[in-house]
Amino acid sequence: MQRIIGTEVEYGISSPSDPTANPILTSTQAVLAYAAAAGIQRAKRTRWDYEVESPLRDARGFDLSRSSGPPPIVDADEVGAANMILTNGARLYVDHAHPEYSAPECTDPMDAVIWDKAGERVMEAAARHVASVPGAAKLQLYKNNVDGKGASYGSHENYLMSRQTPFSAVIAGLTPFMVSRQVVTGSGRVGIGPSGDEPGFQLSQRADYIEVEVGLETTLKRGIINTRDEPHADADKYRRLHVIIGDANLAETSTYLKLGTTSLVLDLIEEGVDLSDLALARPVHAVHVISRDPSLRATVALADGRELTALALQRIYLDRVAKLVDSRDPDPRASHVIETWANVLDLLERDPMECAEILDWPAKLRLLEGFRQRENLTWQAPRLHLVDLQYSDVRLDKGLYNRLVARGSMKRLVTEQQVLDAVENPPTDTRAYFRGECLRRFGADIAAASWDSVIFDLGGDSLVRIPTLEPLRGSKAHVGALLDSVDSAVELVEQLTN
């Protein structure tokens, strides 16, 4: 089981002492405070390389950027001020008025959990550093997807796929899976509808914002399947599946299964396994129906007339994935995902609350029901919306999820030391290692970087771009000895270009 995967999370942000504060400003303060605490001067801060970005290229074969007029002029100084690349290979920046942490590329879902969790520690530290700045208002950051006022912000997943797989097969095979997986991956939400005005509890924070089956947009008319075709790799060989339907998860089992099961279902699709019998009659409607039924008993209509629950759909995918994995050479990583997936589905079938120590939405629902019973509250009570928000607070001593972990009421898959190491260090088995180590060792000599290149400024007449189009190259095994053998960026570039 080896697929390049990673997460990118826009964090909710607020300034309790100044509710009217501009979120772009406060998000910028968070990023800059983290950079300052890391001792990175603005003049030496590595910028993001936008030259290779193509967010309007569509996997269905067209490019909206060609018909939208000349590209906007980006002020590198203005953007770069709140845009940094970390020594762990991640990107920390301001996106749509939110601080965003884009994790480095991983090959294993458990590693992806570690570097995703590292983002929570980065954001917690950023808010703490802002509070230490004289005159700056305190900030609170939340790993969630809704602001309670009708807006949603993203927690996206990325999966590298073979370009040879027709995108139509991706849409057909993945749609029923994405619709049904929220029984495992939902983070839970108080309120129904985009603004949360209707009282109740639902599985997913993202479900009410899904409007179409397939689409390019990520901020409006959001699709179950996103069609952005921006591989950040060799475009002749790869496509990057950009998933926007998912929730921001804190529970490590939720994150692990979100990434691991999706990766294995993509194996099915790439192998050409026929999944057409799982087509849904009304996929967008099914997203909403499943999210709004915490009992997990609601059924959705398939195109062939059958009615199945989300758990039943997940079991069909599980069985087909297990059959594929059994036909291959032994793969302990894939087997562990399958075992965990099967166990979670069994628990959910028996009683969803049996997953309250491992999945987000049951954990949150258990907390909320406790408040409701103790204080005789209805789902309309504002207090419950506050509990919902506090669950996602990234502060280790205040966030309700983190407090559950501290008292042993939430099970972890990884150790805190692994997470803290990942805050500083990149994964060793992808190009993120080369990017992160270059930043650590030669940061002052790097002008810019992106997922697929590192650009050096060695004082000559021109910059030197080192492409990293193969995500599995640039690993420690590939370049570790080279990096250890050179004393300067000049030597490194000479070795690489010669």
UniProtKB/Swiss-Prot annotation:
Residues reported in the UniProt entry to bind Mg(2+) 2: 8, 156, 242
Active site per UniProt: 95 (proton acceptor)
Cofactor note: ATP is required for the deamidation reaction but is not hydrolyzed during this reaction.
UniProt-listed Enzyme Commission number(s): 3.4.-.-, 3.5.1.119
BP GO annotations: modification-dependent protein catabolic process; proteasomal protein catabolic process; protein pupylation
Catalysed conversion reaction: [prokaryotic ubiquitin-like protein]-C-terminal-L-glutamine + H2O = [prokaryotic ubiquitin-like protein]-C-terminal-L-glutamate + NH4(+)
Binding, Mg(2+) 1: 8, 93, 100
Binding site for ATP: 6-10, 102-103, 158, 240
Keywords recorded for this protein, A-Z: ATP-binding, Hydrolase, Magnesium, Metal-binding, Nucleotide-binding
Top EC class for this record: hydrolase
Role summary: Specifically catalyzes the deamidation of the C-terminal glutamine of the prokaryotic ubiquitin-like protein Pup to glutamate, thereby rendering Pup competent for conjugation. Probably also displays depupylase (DPUP) activity, removing conjugated Pup from target proteins; thus may be involved in the recycling of Pup and may function similarly to deubiquitinases (DUBs) in eukaryotes to prevent or promote proteasomal degradation of certain proteins.
Assigned protein family: Belongs to the Pup ligase/Pup deamidase family. Pup deamidase subfamily.
NCBIfam families noted in UniProt: depupylase_Dop
Miscellaneous information on this protein: Is the only enzyme acting as a deamidase of Pup during pupylation.
Name of protein: Pup deamidase/depupylase
Lineage: Bacteria, Bacillati, Actinomycetota, Actinomycetes, Mycobacteriales
